[in-house]
Amino acid sequence: MSALHQTQSTYKGAPGRALWVSTGAFTVCFAIWTIFSIIGVRIKDELGLSEAEFGLLIGMPILTGSLVRIVLGIWTSRYGGRLVYTITMLAAALATFLLAYATTYPQMLLAGLGVGLAGGSFAVGVAYVSPFFPPEKQGTALGIFGAGNVGAAVTKFLAPFVLVAFGWQAVAQVWAAALLLTAVVFWLSTEDDPQFRARRDVGAPRKSFLSEFEPLKNVQVWRFSLYYFFSFGGFVALALWLPRYLVGVYGFDIETAGMIAAAYSIPGSIFRAYGGALSDKLGARKIMYAMFAVSAVATAILSIPAGGAGSAMPILVTPMVFVVVTFVLGFVMSLGKAAVYKHIPVYYPSHVGAVGGIVGMMGGLGGFVLPIAFGFLKDVTGLWSSCFMLLFVIVAVSMVWMNVSIRQIKREADRGLPAGALAR
């Protein structure tokens, strides 16, 4: 069989259906997860919310969707991704539909908890999809799945039209109906993953719930989490922060700033699939080194002090330079997101759910915490560019930690230590 035929056949049949249907489902889930980015503005006006209340409202799904990832990942290992993914989508669809009937702020927050389940679907999808593919194809497969992040752009582009025509409640109802339909299609067109099916067929006892957390004792898991905190959390944070930055520093109108932010989000999501393919071909470690090197240079350039429009401080980074460098940063972040998840099934093939869940949780928390940190630094320093100074510090720490750990792994390998000792 030719190499080309082998590659093509890998993405056909049950593996192909699992990958493409899961990716479509994750795209819809991500669109649901970010629904407050559009309807939240109208809700804020209707309820007369303060800025703090508004921030909590739009952040609630991001926070809960991040925290629930580790639990959903473990449940996927125990009960199978097909079942857990379907139930997660049904629960999120119900919460999104009920959101349309919420009339008070506490009700909105409660609905936001349920909407956040859609964001937790990432951990389910990773644990479900990876067993369908051999190790040399998992980077590409998980990169394609992760490209479902583009669902955020779907909401940004389509939801405003529905909102203007029919109101924010209609957005919630239509998005809920889409997720319900997606859950039905997913259940009817997929099957259980090979690992879960094998355990079920031989009647293998389930691991205890606590044993699922065993890999979390490895420092390596938390190192991967820091990488994803930057590559995914930093990417999401910049997507949220860029409109405010462009308006505050360069005086752009909100429409232009919003379109630039949307243009930053779309390729940044799609190129994740390319990052997975590169990780399979060149190795995830090389991709991580490249991401950190380029990110360090980019964040250093963007850290050049900028006081903003109306400030006496000169703006040394022109709008064109800023947009180009930011897009380069977003591109390498997308490659890095895929490279991080290429590592997980290689190092932890029996704990993809738990490890993928904790890494995904930390990345999601980055998307929640970093915008708050950006605002705090702006208030304290008066510099808009302080957000990139923070990102530079995170990149530097990650790069040093990675380099030290890899050197330690190589030294231990040269001494012939067992594989378990290499989890640094």
Please name every model-derived segment.
Residues 34, 62-70, 120, 152-154, ...:
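Residue-level signature of mid-helix packing/kink "hotspots" within the transmembrane helices
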Residues 48, 80, 101-106, 134, ...:
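Helix-breaking motifs and short loop linkers at transmembrane-helix boundaries and internal kinks
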Residues 144-194:
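Helix-loop-helix hairpin linking two adjacent transmembrane segments in secondary transporters
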Residues 187-213, 411-420:
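Flexible cytoplasmic inter-helical loops of multi-pass small-molecule transporters
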Residues 36-37, 219-270:
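Extracytoplasmic gate region of multi-pass secondary transporters
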Residues 67-106:
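Conserved MFS/SLC helix-loop-helix module at the cytosolic interface between two early adjacent transmembrane helices
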Residues 285-340:
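C-terminal transmembrane helical hairpin of 12-TM major facilitator-type secondary transporters
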Residues 111-148:
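Cytoplasmic helix-loop-helix junction between adjacent transmembrane helices
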